[in-house]
UniProtKB/Swiss-Prot annotation:
GO BP annotations, alphabetical order: fatty acid biosynthetic process; lipid A biosynthetic process
Task performed by this protein: Involved in unsaturated fatty acids biosynthesis. Catalyzes the dehydration of short chain beta-hydroxyacyl-ACPs and long chain saturated and unsaturated beta-hydroxyacyl-ACPs.
Catalytic reaction equation(s): a (3R)-hydroxyacyl-[ACP] = a (2E)-enoyl-[ACP] + H2O
Source organism of the structure: Pseudomonas fluorescens (strain Pf0-1)
Sorted UniProt keywords: Cytoplasm, Lipid A biosynthesis, Lipid biosynthesis, Lipid metabolism, Lyase
Keyword Cytoplasm: yes
Gene: fabZ
Name this polypeptide is given: 3-hydroxyacyl-[acyl-carrier-protein] dehydratase FabZ
């Protein structure tokens, strides 16, 4: 389990772009992670997306899954951004949105390591709310040394 203070050690993102609030499961041997993003009406993106019917932007759901996958990658390598390693989101495959994410929802983020070749990492990711799938994708990240 990781609280927000430890998450901040493994992700370089900060408000308003830090999209993982808590890690509840992390298995480096099984190469999987489960994390939460608590979606509040106070999120800055709700001011414009959409004021009368607020919906979390899909690209931010993808980013939240990528951040959870990034934590898994850092933990698997036993490194942190402060050590000079970063992951850049470079693409996705098999991306699907299934239902909107609304204020008050708890977004459950799951990522499983698929492969790493030439510092290109691939993760199978899923986001859900109340046990219902919201989004799924294969997230592709590039590992870079600073």
């Amino acid at each position: 389990m990781m609280d927000i203070n430890e998450i901040r050690e493994y992700l370089p993102h900060r408000y308003p772009f830090l999209l993982v609030d808590r890690v509840v499961e992390l298995d480096t041997e099984g190469k999987r992670i489960r994390a939460y993003k608590n979606v509040s009406i106070n999120e800055p993106f709700f001011n414009g997306h959409f004021p009368a019917h607020p919906i979390m932007p899909g690209v931010l759901i993808i980013e939240a899954m990528a951040q959870a996958a990034g934590i898994l990658g850092f933990k698997m390598l036993d490194v942190k951004p402060a050590d000079g390693t970063l992951y850049y989101f470079v693409g996705s495959d098999k991306l699907r949105f299934r239902q909107p994410v609304l204020p008050g929802d708890q977004l459950i983020l799951e990522a499983k390591f698929i492969s790493c070749k030439r510092q290109i990492w691939k993760f199978e990711c899923q986001a859900s709310v109340d046990g219902k799938p919201v989004c799924s994708a294969e997230i592709i990240c590039a590992e870079r040394k600073l």
